[in-house]
Amino acid sequence: MAPFGVYRSKAMNIAFLGLGGMGGGMARNLLKHGHSVIAWNRSPEPAAALHADGARIAATPAEAASGAEIAMTMLANDEAVESVTLGANGLAEGLAKGAAHVSMSTISVALSEHLATAHEARGQRFAAAPVFGRPDQAQAGKLFIAVAGAADVVERIRPALDAIGQRSFVIGETPAQANLVKLTGNFLITCVIESLAEAFALTAKGGIETSKVHELLTETLFAAPVYKTYGEIILANRFSPAGFKMALGQKDNRLVQLAAEKLEVPLPFAAIVRDRFLAALAHGDGELDWSAIAKRAAEDAGVTKPG
């Protein structure tokens, strides 16, 4: 199998379901790479905007999936993905035998396993390809993708993934493995946010300018995008508009703990972050970026702002 990124692109008929902050940019990049896109979204405004860019718009998920080689979903949570896939007029009703559903949402391991079984019973194929990145990266086609599924399905969907991301990583042949990797990655991001918030609170309380702390950290031992990006957001108190909403972060924290419980793996840090999310939601911060959990660490330290 050729590496991702060097595969000669093949124009495909693609259904894309879910045109939110991430999905809209992803669908546009499919169009830019010459793919034919038929889209569906619950609310009409994002669909109308994508139609102006050249996509066809379907009235139902089943209609979108009808005639598609692959149907890609980018939706908020388990409930939305299950409803759009297996509910009345769901994509599974329209997807042809042999065609593939590619779930790109951050969903539970359990739902991914259920979708794989449901599609197999219908003679359809299934792969999971959740993404790492924020909305600006989705618009620029610079996402990172964790993909898992049967080798022939992964091979078939590569042109679409190459249009959406800068690099894809094949995790395995069981789709749910990609979902576990995605949940693990999001768990690590929340640990970074919490540790930065605590470090900024400590140094601020000690009378140190936190921007200097951030500069030192990110130009030496912590020169990674996640520290730079979230450190800058926290320092600037730039929690709105949200790149990833607090409520979604809390959802992912819950899902990683469910996965860990099933595998009998303790995640003590996940429990700490869970309480940060619950406190943030209790304070009315559900619409803010998930990095606003940093506000709670600042409050605990008696500091006026996280950075």
Where does each model-flagged region fall?
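Hydrophobic residues within alpha-helices
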Residues: 26-27, 46, 115, 160, ...
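Hydrophobic beta-strand scaffold residues
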Residues: 37, 57, 126-127, 168, ...
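Rossmann-like NAD(P)(H) cofactor-binding subdomain of soluble oxidoreductases
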Residues: 61-66, 70, 75-143
